[in-house]
Design a protein with these regions (language model features):
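A short acidic (Asp/Glu
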Residues: 18, 52-55, 151-157
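Short, highly selective alpha-helical patches that border small-molecule cofactor pockets
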Residues: 22-26, 30, 153
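Conserved nucleotide-sugar donor-interacting segment of glycosyltransferase catalytic cores
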Residues: 117-174
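A short, Lys/Arg-enriched amphipathic alpha-helix followed by its capping loop at the start of a domain
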Residues: 28-38
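A conserved catalytic-core segment of Leloir-type glycosyltransferases
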Residues: 42, 46-134
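Nucleotide-activated donor-dependent transferases that construct or modify glycoconjugates
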Residues: 2-19, 44-46
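Hydrophobic anchor at the start of a short beta-strand
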Residues: 38-40, 91, 139, 171
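A short, glycine/small-residue-rich beta-strand->loop->alpha-helix junction that serves as a flexible
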Residues: 12-25, 51-53
Length: 174
C-alpha cells in the first residue's frame, strides 16, 4: 500500500523565520505528519531575510526556470531546497527577486512592502502548484497555513481540478 501524500503550503516555517506561533506550527505539523508515516512535501516563500548559506539552501535547477505571468509581466520562478534535521524533511522555497528579495534582513516582505501582497500571494501559490506538477507528485491532502497560502484552495479545486497532481485532493486551511 502506498503512503498518503500531504502537501503543506506554509507562510512561515521555523527555523527559517524567527519563532512565532505560525512558524512553529509550520515546522511541527509537517514533522508530526511525516513521523506518522505520511509522505510530505513542504513549501514556503524564500523571504529576503532567510540566510541561504546558514540554512544550506540550494537551487534545484531541474525545477527552476519556468516563468509565471502575473499582471502581464513574466516573473522567473526559482526553486530552492533545504533539509530540516534531524527529521530529514525537505522544505522547498518559492523565490523571485521581484517579490521576495526586496528587504533582505529587514523583516518579511509581506509586512515591509504590503502593496505587492496580492501579486506575491498569486506568485507563491502558482509557483507551489506548478512545482508540484513538475515533480509529478499527487497530493492526497493539501494543507494551507497562513493568509499567503489563501488562494491555494481556489487554484486546487477550480483551476487545477482536473490535473492528475490535484484530482481528488482534499484541502485543509488553517
Amino acid at each position: 500500500m502506498s503512503k498518503e501524500k500531504v502537501l503543506f503550503v506554509n507562510q512561515e516555517i521555523m527555523p527559517y523565520i524567527p519563532e512565532s506561533e505560525m512558524s512553529k506550527a509550520g515546522l511541527d505539523l509537517p514533522k508530526g505528519i511525516q513521523e506518522r508515516g505520511y509522505e510530505v512535501r513542504t513549501f514556503m516563500p524564500k523571504y529576503g531575510c532567510i540566510n541561504e548559506r546558514r540554512n544550506q539552501l540550494h537551487e534545484v535547477i531541474r525545477l527552476s526556470g519556468m516563468n509565471l505571468i502575473i499582471d502581464d509581466t513574466d516573473h522567473p520562478l526559482i526553486i530552492k531546497v533545504a533539509t530540516l534535521q534531524p527529521a530529514r524533511m525537505q522544505v522547498y522555497f518559492i523565490y523571485n527577486e521581484d517579490y521576495f528579495q526586496r528587504n533582505p534582513g529587514k523583516g518579511l516582505e509581506t509586512e515591509e512592502l504590503p502593496e505587492l501582497n496580492d501579486e506575491r500571494c498569486i506568485f507563491f501559490v502558482r509557483g507551489t502548484i506548478e512545482t508540484v506538477k513538475k515533480l509529478r507528485w499527487e497530493a492526497s491532502i493539501v494543507h494551507c497555513q497562513g493568509w499567503l497560502s489563501a488562494l491555494t484552495p481556489l487554484y486546487v479545486k477550480k483551476v487545477y481540478a482536473d490535473d492528475p497532481s490535484f484530482r481528488g485532493s482534499k484541502v485543509v486551511y488553517s
